[in-house]
Regions:
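Expand to "…catalyze enediolate/carbanion chemistry for C-C bond making/breaking, isomerization
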Residues: 1-190
């Protein structure tokens, strides 16, 4: 979800999304605002849409729906700066936050170590975030690390909400595979 684009986020919730990833959350105050905007009363102040896909398009009382949706919908905050990592414990302590997700690519960029996902400073950031998440009963998450040597390191540390890849990369790999196959069928047409 684009940072701060709550209208888009709530539209996604109304249309059946069971979680929202909000990027660049650097402080507990920002995390509280995310919860306030994405959780339904009494936890937050997200507006309840009408009859939606969560209930098979059947009606449900707003109280029943709010409680069920607050329990089912994941509120995922991305920690993508050294400031966010320094504030990880305070962010994790915010009620209604379900997942702390390190955006490793942006974190590396902010640290001045673009693409160095195995750097010890990044590992330290994961240790900090995972400890904070565990202390407050949240899921520690990892995004942006798809290297099959580095990814297991952070999973072994305790990352449990793991983005295993990107849709665009999966599509590009599939397209490259198919293109290679087609070129083999018609070697003279390259």
């Amino acid at each position: 979800m684009p940072n701060g684009e709550y209208a888009i986020a709530t539209r996604a919730l109304d249309n059946g999304a069971l979680g929202i990833v909000m990027p660049h959350v650097d402080s507990a105050a920002e995390a509280r605002e995310v919860v306030n905007r994405l959780k339904y009363p009494p936890v937050g102040h997200c507006s309840m849409g009408g009859i939606g896909p969560h209930y098979g398009l059947r009606s449900a009382s707003s109280g029943e729906a709010a409680a069920a949706l607050n329990a089912a919908n994941l509120t995922i905050v991305m920690l993508e700066t050294p400031t966010a990592i320094a504030n990880a414990e305070e962010i994790a302590a915010v009620p209604g936050v379900d997942v702390l997700l390190i955006g490793t690519n942006d974190l590396c960029a902010e640290m001045g170590i673009h693409g160095d996902f195995g750097n010890e400073r990044v590992a330290d950031a994961y240790r900090t975030m995972i400890a904070a998440a565990r202390k407050h009963g949240k899921f520690p998450g990892m995004a942006g690390v798809y290297n099959e040597t580095i990814m297991p390191r952070y999973v072994e540390m305790g990352a449990r909400f793991v983005l295993g890849g990107q849709d665009a990369a999966f599509m590009a790999a599939g397209a490259a595979q198919r293109t290679g196959f087609l070129r083999k069928l018609s070697p003279g047409l390259q």
